[in-house]
Amino acid sequence: MEQLSAANTRFAVDLFLTLTEHNPAGNIFISPFSISSALAMVFLGARGDTAAQMSKALHFEGVEIHSGFQSLNADINKCGAPYTLKLANRLFGEKSYDFLPEFLASTQEMYSAELASVDFLRAPEDARKTINAWVKEQTGGKIPELLASGMVDSLTKLVLVNAIYFKGKWQEKFMVEATKDAPFRLNKKETKTVKMMYQKKKFPFGYIKDLKCRVLELPYEGKDLSMVILLPDDIQDEATGLKKIEQQLTLEKLREWTRPESLDLLEVRVQLPRFKLEESYDLQEPLARLGVRDLFSSKADLSGMSGAKDLFISKVVHKSVVDVNEEGTEAAAATGAIAEFAMLVPEEEFVADHPFIFFIRHKPSSNILFLGRLSSP
């Protein structure tokens, strides 16, 4: 499981950085875990060069993938958790294709994923509506339209859909009455007014000296999940001020910055904007830049999925929504006890009034469920 978590984090960082290249200053929000998990399902049926390209981009070499995802999904979606986290994957295939029974059995067993047959050939618009209705249901209504009109047509053979929905409450809630209007600096020149939440409590807090960057961990109820925020002291470059951090982002660095030894439980005065992000991605181009090329063309070898040789993935659409407020976080994406001592604790300031990087992680497995950059609340 540890190897799989490392692979997923490497892929998360790679994909995030690929998206930042094309979008150096805007908001970004993805669920890398759900994208990895959805692609792993396709990987079950990939062979030859297609499988090799996927394995390399997803860092799957030498990793127990399918049984790993099976136990990881069970661990993260566990019953009785104080949060709601629902991961749902499904392949929608053209109904005139015959899919291999062993592939269908494997996806069901490992990913609890059905293959739904739809009539792309004769009724693509009905197929699109069927897919959207399923995603809407799986995300508690947060993502009502994953596929826009015209996204599928009569040539579509296979669409990979993945949705993840998260709703968690902060362990330490922000008091609504403490929220005030405050300026948020978008860059060195522009500001906008936001609803700034405030609280003073003990949180795991760290400082990365060479990056001049603060690290704050805000746990959710139950402590299995937390949001980690990387906030530079100031805007250093001409865009969001996050270039320096983005240039150093790797699995190893992330682990080093956020491991328990790097963070101290300190009294922190936290100012964090209330924000909601809703981002949509067609992942074909970013995945191609990471080396997954054949999957989306007639070169694809998905012979482990169907006897047909002309099967390829038409679309990988990922849409994610996160809503951060005083109570906690609602995010949807379609992709030990501490002894406390009474003593005078130095106070730290954490004023998130300019762009920052944040991620929501599942601590027991070290998986990054969501990863984003807030440039403009």
UniProtKB/Swiss-Prot annotation:
Subcellular location: Secreted; Cytoplasm; Cytolytic granule; Early endosome
Site for Reactive bond, residues: A342, M343
Family: Belongs to the serpin family. Ov-serpin subfamily.
The keyword Magnesium is annotated on this UniProt entry: no
Function (record text): Neutrophil serine protease inhibitor that plays an essential role in the regulation of the innate immune response, inflammation and cellular homeostasis. Acts primarily to protect the cell from proteases released in the cytoplasm during stress or infection. These proteases are important in killing microbes but when released from granules, these potent enzymes also destroy host proteins and contribute to mortality. Regulates the activity of the neutrophil proteases elastase, cathepsin G, proteinase-3, chymase, chymotrypsin, and kallikrein-3.
Modification sites for N6-acetyllysine: K136
Chain residue ranges for the region called CARD-binding motif (CBM): 349-377
InterPro entries in alphabetical order: Serpin_CS (IPR023795), Serpin_dom (IPR023796), Serpin_fam (IPR000215), Serpin_sf (IPR036186), Serpin_sf_1 (IPR042178), Serpin_sf_2 (IPR042185)
Primary localization class, coarse: secreted
Residues annotated with Phosphoserine modification: S298
Record organism: Bos taurus (Bovine)
PROSITE patterns in alphabetical order: SERPIN
Protein name from the UniProt record: Leukocyte elastase inhibitor
Gene (name only): SERPINB1
Subunit structure: Monomer. Interacts (via C-terminus) with CASP1; CASP4 (via CARD domain) and CASP5; these interactions regulate the activity of inflammatory caspases. Interacts with PRTN3. Interacts with GZMH.
Keywords: Acetylation, Cytoplasm, Disulfide bond, Endosome, Lysosome, Phosphoprotein, Protease inhibitor, Secreted, Serine protease inhibitor
Pfam families per record: Serpin (PF00079)
GO biological process, one term: negative regulation of interleukin-1 beta production
Chain coiled-coil ranges: none
